């Protein structure tokens, strides 16, 4: 058995770097177009969901061929800086477990041949959630203005806070069987063999992203985005395993034994039956 339980939390004030500022920078560097990020089919376009969610929840917007975060101001040379002090928080929670259940049976044939049978089941669960929060210590430092092509201000607001959350979950079940035989054909001599069937594990993965950005002021508004429900189902099969052994006892002097185990890892198989892209 195993467990994967963990809670992490961090908080602090920062006036030099911003989570959504980095998101905007990476989206600019990757060359994602605003029309692609804002499309109703953006989550199926191959663009990482993080940037789609961030853009559609107004965490960053295009400006002079780059993206600028709601927490940033822009110099004349198109370089960006954090506009003021931010109260930043990060949280992560993981949980999960792995268990193996086995049913055993044994047979004895005249104290000469012994047979053991195991029927087993593996189960696993895992979930991962993390969030990033940024809140303006003073919203007046974070003026956001949108202008038309003539330079006229068409919208004026102040960044107040944002939250980005990502969730992932996995569950799986696998089945296997083992059989072992030990035989004592004559005194002092013992032979044995074990066989484990391939383990076929069915695994289901799901994930989801969501974002929210709050603006205050004259044209203040709350923008939010929620990704579709991503899902991937796949099957993982491990190879058959077998082992053989023989031993002979030389009275009170010692024992001679030989063992051999075989397993062809080239027979491992992975097959996906449903897949929704997310990188």
Residue ranges and their predicted role:
Residues 2-279:
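Outer-membrane beta-barrel porins/channels
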